[in-house]
Amino acid sequence: MKVAANSSKMLAEKLELMKGGRRRRRRSRRRRRRSRRRSRSPYRRRYRRRRRRRRRRSRRRRYRRRRSYSRRRYRRRR
């Protein structure tokens, strides 16, 4: 009987951990929101600008006619 009782308790604890218990959920959500706000504003904007400049320079040298089409498509997507 003891073994069965322990196994049921272990299963209940595992389910709570998988669901992410109330305490853990609140902490994780707050941390994620803060980290996303901080990372989006300074880091991602600089990174995207650098990437676009590099791609435009490389495409000007290789494909002069296709450049206009690629720029229009990028603006529509992003």
Swiss-Prot record:
Name under which the protein is recorded: Spermatid-specific protein T1
GO CC list: nucleosome; nucleus
Organism: Sepia officinalis
Taxonomic placement: Eukaryota, Metazoa, Spiralia, Lophotrochozoa, Mollusca
Sequence ranges of Basic residues compositional bias: 20-78
Tagged with keyword Repeat: no
Residue segments, region Disordered: 1-78
Membrane-spanning intervals of the chain: none
GO molecular function, one term: DNA binding
Key words, A-Z: Chromosome, Developmental protein, Differentiation, DNA condensation, DNA-binding, Nucleosome core, Nucleus, Phosphoprotein, Spermatogenesis
PTM field: Phosphorylation occurs at different degrees. The triphosphorylated form may be predominant in T1. SP1 appears to be phosphorylated in elongated spermatids, but dephosphorylated in mature sperm cells.
One BP annotation, GO: chromosome condensation
Tissue-specific expression: Testis.
Major localisation: nucleus
Ranges where the record places region Hydrophobic: 1-21
Compartments where found: Nucleus; Chromosome
Protein role: Cuttlefish spermiogenesis is characterized by a double nuclear protein transition: histones -> spermatid-specific proteins (T1/T2) -> protamines (SP1/SP2). The protamines compact sperm DNA into a highly condensed, stable and inactive complex.
